[in-house]
């Protein structure tokens, strides 16, 4: 309530940190996407690249995917100092890991007839991939990149919590000082930024899917604008600051990661790794389930296929507002309502899940075949039974994969919610890193890697069953 009305006089002080946030997200997304495009074919199982390279790449991707952008940013500050360079480095790694996995999975599922024909003509594997596989998967690849850009804006907005630049430091400061009118202004600017990026992403996605067309001159201007935006964001980044980078600290860091604290790793106490990881999984699981239950009906209210346009516009706006707020901010807000602990973490991830799941469910509804539903309506069947018998059977596999993906995301987000007192493994990990207790940090990171790997295996089996 104290955020309304926002302090509009504070906008001028927000613009530069907001630019840094956009700068990190744009540069990190483009660089991470580029590296993923170049290296992802080496991870595909059906293209004949050496198995050793494929295994090494997949192990690296698995390790990087185990950590949220905030943890990657905190690690980067020890290497490159404080500032936007560390934040951009973290967003690049985060994007690279996700995009590489998605792309080599798409390549593995693609039709390889054109690829095999080119190989039979003596074309090298990589060139055959470019001409035989890439044209098939590039629309999905670019769509995933646009979705990650929107996600990375929210990630970049909290990297200031660990000194990696952007609007996060300002946001944390104003929340700590209880200046909620200024917090409202910051969140309003983030919301407007997310709205602009989402509209632009939808426009580009429609061009990619050939649902819209533009003239050649307009296409050239669009490419020129995108190139200029990337160059401006890249060449105005802060340079890495190695003046505070201690070689001894780096040696201790890597030694701690290679020789973790095994007593903490195997501890069965309440403050041991096993209990904290279990708490993290429970927070992520319950938050995902609550989010999925709420999101399913909201998705039907969010699309013009099932409700009038004004109703869908209203719900679209509400969901966009929910998605524009960084998850750590929700954690800080709910702590003041329910106090610190795992329950706050569940509330936080439930609300964040509603934002993402409703968006993805709506996209699935917009893409389904509506003819069975309209046929049942024409026969006099009421809308709810018609949805149950014609829509839900089509959506079950898609909804399942979306929910599993969100659970995977929630595991990583739950792993840093402890930073604001919302339970899980986050607080011990960040405190260990800030206190240079690298053996304990190494044990926690190893636990996260194994946890995410196990969840990936379970998710793959569930997905295969669907």
What are these regions (language model features)?
Residues 25, 29-41, 45, 70, ...:
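Hydrophobic positions within alpha-helical transmembrane segments of bacterial inner-membrane proteins
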Residues 38-73, 102, 297-331:
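Cytoplasmic-entry segments and transmembrane alpha-helices of multi-pass inner-membrane transporters
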Residues 1-26, 30, 34, 46, ...:
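N-terminal, non-cleaved signal-anchor transmembrane helix
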Residues 143, 181-237, 442-466:
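C-terminal transmembrane helix and the adjacent membrane-cytosol boundary/short C-terminal tail
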Residues 61-95, 319-350:
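Generic hydrophobic transmembrane alpha-helix motif, especially the helices
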Residues 15-23, 57-64, 150, 172, ...:
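Alpha-helical membrane-interface segments at transmembrane helix boundaries
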Residues 78, 152-190, 336, 412-448, ...:
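Glycine-rich helix-loop "coupling/hinge" segments at transmembrane-helix boundaries
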Residues 82-148, 155, 199, 340-391, ...:
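Membrane-cytosol interface at the C-terminal ends of specific transmembrane alpha-helices
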């Amino acid at each position: 309530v104290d955020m309304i009305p926002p302090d509009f006089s504070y906008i001028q002080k927000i613009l530069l940190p907001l630019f840094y946030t956009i700068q990190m997200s744009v540069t990190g997304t483009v660089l991470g996407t580029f590296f993923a495009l170049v290296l992802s074919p080496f991870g595909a199982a059906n293209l004949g690249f050496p198995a050793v390279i494929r295994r090494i790449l997949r192990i690296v991707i698995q390790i990087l995917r185990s950590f949220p952008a905030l943890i990657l940013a905190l690690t980067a500050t020890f290497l490159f100092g404080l500032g936007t360079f560390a934040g951009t480095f973290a967003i690049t790694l985060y994007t690279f890991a996700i995009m590489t996995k998605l792309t080599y999975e798409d390549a593995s599922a693609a039709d390889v007839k054109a690829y095999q024909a080119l190989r039979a003509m003596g074309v090298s594997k990589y060139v055959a991939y470019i001409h035989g596989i890439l044209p098939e998967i590039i629309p999905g690849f670019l769509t995933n990149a646009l979705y990650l850009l929107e996600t990375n804006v929210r990630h970049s907005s909290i990297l200031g919590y660990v000194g990696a630049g952007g609007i996060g430091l300002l946001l944390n400061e104003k929340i700590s000082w209880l200046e909620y009118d200024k917090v409202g202004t910051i969140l309003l600017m983030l919301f407007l930024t997310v709205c602009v990026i989402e509209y632009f992403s939808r426009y580009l996605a429609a061009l990619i899917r050939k649902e819209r067309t533009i003239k050649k001159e307009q296409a050239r201007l669009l490419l020129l604008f995108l190139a200029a935006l990337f160059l401006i964001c890249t060449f105005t980044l802060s340079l890495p600051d190695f003046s505070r980078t201690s070689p001894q600290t780096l040696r201790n860091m890597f030694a701690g990661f290679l020789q973790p604290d095994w007593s903490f790793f195997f501890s069965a106490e309440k403050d041991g790794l096993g209990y904290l990881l279990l708490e993290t999984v429970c927070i992520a699981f319950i938050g995902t389930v609550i989010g999925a239950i709420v999101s399913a009906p909201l998705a039907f209210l969010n699309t013009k296929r099932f409700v009038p346009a004004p109703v869908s516009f209203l719900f679209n706006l509400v969901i966009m507002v929910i998605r524009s707020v960084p998850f750590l901010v929700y954690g800080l807000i709910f702590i003041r309502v329910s106090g610190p602990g795992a329950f706050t973490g569940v509330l936080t991830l439930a609300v964040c899940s509603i934002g993402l799941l409703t968006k993805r469910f709506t996209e699935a509804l917009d893409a389904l075949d509506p003819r069975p539903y309209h046929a049942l309506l024409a026969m006099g069947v009421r809308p709810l039974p018609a949805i149950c018998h014609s829509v839900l059977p089509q959506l079950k596999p898609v909804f399942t994969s979306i929910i599993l993906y969100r659970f995977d995301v929630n595991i990583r987000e739950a792993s840093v919610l402890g930073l604001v007192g919302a339970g899980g493994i986050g607080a011990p990990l960040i405190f260990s890193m800030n206190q240079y207790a690298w053996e304990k940090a190494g044990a926690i990171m190893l636990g996260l890697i194994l946890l995410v790997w196990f969840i990936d295996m379970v998710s793959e089996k569930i997905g295969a069953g669907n």
